Structure formats: C-alpha cells, structure tokens
C-alpha cells in the first residue's frame, strides 16, 4: 500500500513552537548521531551511502512541520531505544520466532519497527501507534518501504477511550515498547496511558511492557520552559509506585524491574547538546539530578 502524500500540518495555535533558532533544532548531523541507523538506511532502505546525511536532514525538516518535538529537531528518531535495553536479546529472539506481536507506543517515524524488521522479525507482527499521522507517513518516506512493510501503523490518541483503531488491537499484543513516552505527561495522564497499555497487552502471564524514559532523582511535577506546561519526572521508586496504582486499578499483577541510571550523555542527547559546564538547569532538565529510567514489567 502506498503511503499518503505528506503535507505541512502545523498546529496554528502553536506557531511559536516551529521556530528553528532553538537548542533542540540541530543543523549538523554527525556519524555518531546516525549510528546504527546507517546500515538500516543503506541496506534496508537502499539509500546510497553518500546520500544518507542529506536524506535524513530533508526528511527531518518535513517531520518538523508535523510537530517540532525535540526528538525531531535533535535527530533523536535515529537513536534506537530497544536494542540498548538489557532485555533486547531475549525479546528479539521471541519476536524472530514469528509467534509474538510487538507494539511501539509513541512510535514517531517507526524507527524501532524498521530496526526489528531489518533484524529478521516478520514485519506483519509489528504495530506502531503515534498521535500524528504525519510521522507515520514520513516514516514510509524515510525508510522507502511503503510497498514492502507489512506492519500495522495506527494514528491514534491513547487517551481517547473511543478510539476504534486501538480497540481493534486490545488484548492482541505480547510486547509493548515505550521509549521516551510516559515522561511526556503528568502523573494522572501516565496512569491513564499505562492502563491503556494493560488493555493492549494479552491478558496472560508473560506479557511485557519494556522501555526507558527521562527521570529525576527528585521525583515530582516539573515545569517546562516557555509555554510547554509541566510533566511528572520519576525516580525508580515513584515509577514503581505508579505501577502499583495501575495494578490495583486494573486488577493485574506485575513482576517489576526498574533501574535508575546516571547518564550525562543522555542529558546532552535529550537537551540538544547543552553544555553541562554552563548550566545549572534547562527547563525541567537538571544535569545533576536527571536520570535515565530503564524498566521492564512482566505480567504475572
């Protein structure tokens, strides 16, 4: 199936957010940033090696017009989350068997799905959900696979209880991946999203939620810069506490593994390369207290 044509989809109420003179819009793209995405683009997508950098920049600027998230401006969509998780070898092996289904929530341009497809996972067993149809369309363009990818890509709002496309996949997923997703919201919104994830997963022991997100040693609601409001940043204990609430409200039980990791490079990546020597804080990011929260919840 051919991907729809991508057109500018700016939110007129947030025109201020699309300016490019901000720290989270990078003009240069290094080989280090491209990283493991280069062989995927060259060998899976058939982008000529000498064209990879300009191809990424061109498609990135189209994605910026859909919505100017930091992960777009900083080329964060090139960074693969799942392959760096300790559970990845086991999850990959189970997916390669062709008997398990996988859903990436907040999938952006579907980079995790293409990585798994490139690694030998049957693409028809892969699902992606994102709020913005434009990102899904741009993913087809970036990876040049609109005629070959068999994955199911859904434009949906996880907070919309009436979403028919999400209802159609409830109870059908073995592994849900959430990379840099939950940290976008406040506590109550995270609980709501987590309960939706519970419904998406198969209602049986062994179903998995895996991922990572930005956290803070001092858990709490954190103000964001400018007009961006606030969101809840967890430490390991508060993230476990939230899932205790989710378990109680859904009548489910979970084996919980959470790690709180100090990672200065993660801070740089997520803030657009802010110089740690020159800042004490950056919006809701603090170089001394920001942590990477890595988690795996397995249904018992």
From Swiss-Prot:
UniProt keyword annotation of S-adenosyl-L-methionine present: yes
Binding site for S-adenosyl-L-methionine: 130-131, 157-158
Annotated GO MF terms: methyltransferase activity
Alphabetized UniProt keyword annotations: Methyltransferase, S-adenosyl-L-methionine, Transferase
Keyword Transferase: yes
Pathway terms, separated by semicolons: Secondary metabolite biosynthesis
EC number: 2.1.3.-
Signal peptide feature range: none
Uses in biotechnology: Phomoidrides A and B (also known as CP-225,917 and CP-263,114) are potent inhibitors of Ras farnesyltransferase and squalene synthase. CP-225,917 and CP-263,114 inhibit Ras farnesyl transferase from rat brain with IC(50) values of 6 uM and 20 uoM, respectively. CP-225,917 inhibits squalene synthase with an IC(50) value of 43 uM and CP-263,114 with an IC(50) of 160 uM.
Catalytic reaction annotation: phomoidride A + S-adenosyl-L-methionine = (-)-phomoidride B + methanol + S-adenosyl-L-homocysteine + H(+)
GO terms (BP aspect): methylation
Pfam families in alphabetical order: Methyltransf_25
Homology family: Belongs to the class I-like SAM-binding methyltransferase superfamily.
Function recorded in the entry: O-methyltransferase; part of the gene cluster that mediates the biosynthesis of the antihypercholesterolemic agents phomoidrides which are dimeric anhydrides. Within the pathway, phiE catalyzes the acetalization reaction that converts phomoidride A to phomoidride B. The pathway begins with the highly reducing polyketide synthase phiA that catalyzes the formation of a C12-fatty acyl-ACP, starting from one acetate and 5 malonate units. The hydrolase phiM is involved in the release of the C12-fatty acyl chain from phiA.
Record text on subunit structure and interactions: Homodimer.
Protein name (database record): O-methyltransferase phiE
